[in-house]
């Protein structure tokens, strides 16, 4: 009759982040170009993920859970900031195209 740890390796509630969930979030952040736009935040997420793995191996589940939650938040923030930056770049490109078209129209009118 051993006691089960409070940490879960699978999601059991909204607040419980599994190792797999946190790793997926870090992968998603990389897919959102976080390596380019938010490398420090992405590295923090990946480091916390690695530290959490070590804590799980040492059965320090509450500490691992906190690190997994932090890693997930860092990864989500890195992804969101990267997506925002990509959107800003797309808007800037569209604005340049509009400006070029306006300049052409003005030249054609002259």
What is the predicted role of each segment?
Residues 1-2:
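Sec-dependent N-terminal signal peptides
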Residues 5-110:
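Long, charged/polar, soluble alpha-helical segments
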């Amino acid at each position: 009759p051993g006691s089960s740890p409070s940490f879960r390796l699978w999601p059991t509630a909204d607040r419980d982040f599994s190792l797999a969930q946190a790793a997926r979030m870090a992968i998603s952040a990389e897919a959102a170009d976080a390596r380019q736009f938010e490398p420090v935040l992405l590295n923090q997420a990946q480091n916390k993920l690695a530290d959490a793995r070590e804590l799980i191996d040492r059965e320090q589940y509450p500490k691992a859970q906190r690190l997994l939650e932090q890693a997930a938040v860092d990864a989500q923030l890195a992804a969101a900031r990267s997506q925002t930056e990509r959107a800003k770049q797309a808007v800037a490109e569209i604005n340049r195209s509009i400006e070029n078209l306006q300049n052409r129209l003005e030249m054609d009118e002259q």
